[in-house]
């Protein structure tokens, strides 16, 4: 089997290297004869090891097991106390330890002082500013590096260069840590005061980042970048990432476009051989020079030198180095500040009376008009979502914090919880539930705060508002978003598009007579000057809308929404500062409202329109596109003459002056060839993404387990790899080995094998081959998948107790009664299941389920029990199909040019042969008629799983289902009797299968699955009309071909002669596919 098991075995010998250590392999087989031998083999191994005998003779005797059975897990057994890390580390600590510059950062606590200098006592101490927030320890990370170094110490040629580079960097890390001793973590993977008091406060998070960086070093340039970042980030914990990545916003404006991709009328990318010259005024070069000087002032040498050298000819070929530096800068780790500083940062802005009130006025009116435009149609038509807004809000109520911990009673059980959903249930049960009253957030009841940490930026605060705010805003915001969905200005929400579409939009209109203006408005969004005009614009819009309807329910919805805006104009926040909780009047907009994203986009669109209308007073141009995307906005302006240096400089200065008239602290730039925004940047006509996801430090602690985090780690590694930042795969696998191991007792540990972690079961963590999702079809794979399915659904006593309490039942019944016109088991059960699932975020429930799962897993990893299941997985379907396919060699030539230079070669090759796609494949069922019919009459949104179940019911039952959701019997009858219904069956099945096959994740989201080049490699004779079967055969063939091409860099063609008799069987099976959720699929989802 694969490389993983080999690494696993070597890693165990490396870690448990004493005389007493034993490794016992555990095998399994789906063949009952061989399975008996497996069990015998295991028993004898355990026996021999107890007697201290060698296992070698057994390996000979049971060669049949080792050759033919599948490795299930490794049992490792060692008496040794585990201080091996320190012993091994000494051998690498040959260098000079780093000394922190204690004046490098403005805020005292951001300096890397000895912990006891920052915190006098254990009571004062907090780890929140340096907590790696990941369920793996520094000692494990050190072990993983030393294991890699030992394994590769005899490498030759180029591999030896990599070894030497990494060894050199690790010497810095090892020497520094060795000086203070390795900090020991507690059972929650946190570092306590006792451990940290005599060590530098940021030692752990710095070491994690450094290890992540040094294990991503391959070339000499990587080495120089990493060395500089590792050394400087030891002292500079505040501005380093920002300094290093700042120049990028200008660099993108310096490269000529010589051939690019543009979006055509069909929303596809097509190549255009246009040439656009980069026109750069001297002023811009001066600004860039200033940035480079700032880097040098901060002690950087090699990185500014690389940028300076690139500036000589600004070539696109060498730009990959610039994009590398930009990505690397994020890997210095998160900047975590104290809440008080994060909050005051936004309040420090000087308020000046000297602002252009006319512009503010225009800005407010634009916001008002946009709100009206977005909501006009639903309001005039008395849309049911706006009428039943409260119910809609309750159905999608999150289980996030409600800001305070309360004591709640569920039946006989008393619970302390902060969760919104639980508070709602409790309030309803005690008659305290008043959604018509929006609680005040003024000085008597200040808002508690959450935080958001990002590398290279300051910490931002998040409002944790009472659930009434969510209910009041939910329905209206949903309507705003569905408007934004078909409005191209809103790049983030535009229907099923992905970032490639936005890229083609920009390049499409670039030419010698256009310039593109791009602005980062993140400062503006959270500035005080924004809040009054912003909220007032929304309020004025809502007032106009209220006059467009006579429906009291719609008016009520709009009024409650308006009330949230009024309350938030006078908001106070509570900030813990040491032991006191400070109340501060906070006059700015913060995240945390349901409307945050939508409203910010509206405001940013209004802002750029205001700016453009001022510019239009002075210049004559046509605005070709305006886009807002999160905190950024950009516009392409077309002039009637060719653009000159002087023009670019004038427009640039005018734009900046206009922003300053509104006292908006934004970074506005003008270029003729490229843009840089938070999500992506375009340079030389190509698109780039920042590969800045931290692997060994996390932003915050959630309730994910080690297995989940191992899957997230792998998923982050894959995303970075696609974006051009590659970490050594062996290192990632070693981390997975560490994070998925399960302790049985102090000296006994169980390590799952590759088969367990890569089969798509409920325990899947990674793919055996990067970018390729395999669906095992061999006997052993299907066997293990069945086994795991049997133990995935663990019960939780606490959850059952809550769910059987009157409080919970009443709540679910209340929702069902409000929602349903007539009783319907499917829907009621659906609601109950959803509500019960929300309890999972309550820690005790989660832990209980997890414990049960781990103990079941432990049993299973030692001796799998065969399990007869009537559940069918996607693997079963593919297994039925596979035998009918015949493979032959084929040839596809490269015919598309590169547009995403950072892609790994094998993925790039596939795209160049079959092309890319600019849209998301619909995998939610929302495009089906039944889904549209339901949303026309009801606020209920069935999941793809539920639609898939419903659509395969008998027609009578489908009709009842629809009627119970408020669809008029006539419409329901018409639907079931029409052709649309049979089309829907196909549509929903298609969506469901796409969803199961993760077609919108990983690198599959980049490939054009409908490529004619791909189609011509597949030959399937047409027999009978079962479109669903044809669909699955084709999709299987496409995935097979693409996976083969990614792996081997060559093409195959497939012929399938599927017997007609089997088709009906397959079709029936296809209506019983069970969806599998695993840490792996959750991690994919988490990436979204």
From Swiss-Prot:
Matching PROSITE patterns: RDRP_DSRNA_REO
Subcellular location: Virion
Entry's EC annotation: 2.7.7.48
Cofactor field: Mg(2+)
Catalytic activity: RNA(n) + a ribonucleoside 5'-triphosphate = RNA(n+1) + diphosphate
InterPro entries: DNA/RNA_pol_sf, RNA-dir_pol_4-hel_dom, RNA-dir_pol_luteovirus, RNA-dir_pol_reovirus, Rotavirus_VP1_C
Start and end residues of each RdRp catalytic domain: 501-687
An MF annotation (GO) of this entry: RNA binding
GO biological process: DNA-templated transcription; viral genome replication
Pfam family, one: Rotavirus_VP1
Primary subcellular site in the record, as a coarse category: virion
Family from the record: Belongs to the reoviridae RNA-directed RNA polymerase family.
Quaternary state and interactors: Interacts with VP3 (Potential). Interacts with VP2; this interaction activates VP1. Interacts with NSP5; this interaction is probably necessary for the formation of functional virus factories. Interacts with NSP2; this interaction is weak.
Role of this protein: RNA-directed RNA polymerase that is involved in both transcription and genome replication. Together with VP3 capping enzyme, forms an enzyme complex positioned near the channels situated at each of the five-fold vertices of the core. Following infection, the outermost layer of the virus is lost, leaving a double-layered particle (DLP) made up of the core and VP6 shell. VP1 then catalyzes the transcription of fully conservative plus-strand genomic RNAs that are extruded through the DLP's channels into the cytoplasm where they function as mRNAs for translation of viral proteins.
Protein name in the entry: RNA-directed RNA polymerase
Organism, as annotated: Rotavirus A (strain RVA/Human/United Kingdom/ST3/1975/G4P2A[6]) (RV-A)
